[in-house]
Amino acid sequence: MFKTINKSITSILLLLISFYQKWFSPFFGPRCRFIPSCSSYGYEAITRHGPWKGGWLTLKRLSRCHPLTPCGCDPVPD
């Protein structure tokens, strides 16, 4: 049952990220300070690590994405 819940949450989160990438991101233009972009990072983190750890990694990344943080390459950890 826990695996089913994890898969459902993963699917919902990935759907939300895909929706953002397709419908909202083109209007805002490139704003992320990192490579890969925050939405791509979130998609990869959730795909690799599942909804809980991947979601946490994504939230940490989003909290670092602001003008006071140095930009650069920030890949998803293994």
From Swiss-Prot:
Look up and give the membrane topology term: Peripheral membrane protein
Which function does this protein serve? Answer: Could be involved in insertion of integral membrane proteins into the membrane.
Q: Which InterPro entries match?
A: Membr_insert_effic_factor_YidD
* Keywords linked to the UniProt accession: Cell inner membrane, Cell membrane, Membrane
One family name in Pfam for this protein: YidD
Q: Which organism is it from?
A: Prochlorococcus marinus (strain MIT 9301)
> Which cell locations does it reside in?
Cell inner membrane
Please identify the protein, giving its name as recorded: Putative membrane protein insertion efficiency factor
One GO term of the cellular component aspect? plasma membrane
To which protein family does this belong? Belongs to the UPF0161 family.
